[in-house]
Amino acid sequence: MASKAGLGQTPATTDARRTQKFYRGSPGRPWLIGAVVIPLLIAAIGYGAFERPQSVTGPTGVLPTLTPTSTRGASALSLSLLSISRSGNTVTLIGDFPDEAAKAALMTALNGLLAPGVNVIDQIHVDPVVRSLDFSSAEPVFTASVPIPDFGLKVERDTVTLTGTAPSSEHKDAVKRAATSTWPDMKIVNNIEVTGQAPPGPPASGPCADLQSAINAVTGGPIAFGNDGASLIPADYEILNRVADKLKACPDARVTINGYTDNTGSEGINIPLSAQRAKIVADYLVARGVAGDHIATVGLGSVNPIASNATPEGRAKNRRVEIVVN
């Protein structure tokens, strides 16, 4: 019986051990509280370590920022140096251009100065890193400067400086107006001087005693031009034939032919047009035998109107050429 009893107790012990190995009771309340609180404490510690208050360690005030420099503003203050100077029949060019096209624009604008027989000293260099003044519309400036034998133009940063000796304040102002119209964003400094009145020479005699009055009597006043035109009419040729005769009779006489326009359009258009009108009259006089080196021409644009530009009749009178004995 004892043997049976021992055998009967063994399975009970085995079942008990199996029950202890695979069966777990519910976790207690303290364990659950710890499982919730401990992660919260860790998160709070991490926040305190990595999230610094701005009031303690952050910068105060407005933070400086880096902004790109405006290319337009920078170019206005960093134009390359350029010098254009005229001495009689010699024009000297010194400076830098970024490419051949920019240099070609200057040479085209200089057409009014580069007459046959003019010597050009070209010391222009091409440097791709520089910024230069735009001369693509600058021809009126040099056309207006033709009567100034020592004309100079200098470009430095954002300033254009004009120099030379003009025969009159009209010529001085014409160059300034042309430069201002061509480069409205530049500072234009007009240092052109006006020559003083030359001491009177011995009085002329005969038909040359009062040549200006004689020419005025022949022309009957200024020679007029049609709207936007630079062409002479048959009546003008008859008048200029008689003017040429007067000038040839006074071989020492010198004249300036001033061209004008009405106030229609900008001076960038008016000055070249007025210069063209003066030149066509001068060319005809030369063709009739007047010495070319005794004639100077200048385009003055719309300045010095002789009639009101408010009416078509007044504008027609202002489109004119005047022959002035020097």
Swiss-Prot record:
Region (Disordered): 1-21
UniProt record similarity statement: Belongs to the outer membrane OOP (TC 1.B.6) superfamily. ArfA family.
Matching PANTHER family: LIPOPROTEIN YIAD-RELATED (PTHR30329:SF21), STATOR ELEMENT OF FLAGELLAR MOTOR COMPLEX (PTHR30329)
Organism of origin: Mycobacterium tuberculosis (strain ATCC 25618 / H37Rv)
High-level lineage: Bacteria, Bacillati, Actinomycetota, Actinomycetes, Mycobacteriales
GO cellular component, one term: cytosol
Induction: Induced at low pH (at protein level), upon infecting a human monocytic cell line and in murine bone marrow macrophages. Part of the arfA-arfB-arfC operon. Maximal expression of ArfA requires the full operon.
Organism superkingdom: Bacteria
Principal localisation: secreted
Residue segments, region Required for protein translocation to the outer membrane: 1-73
Official protein name in the record: Peptidoglycan-binding protein ArfA
BON domain location: 127-196
Cofactor: Zn(2+)
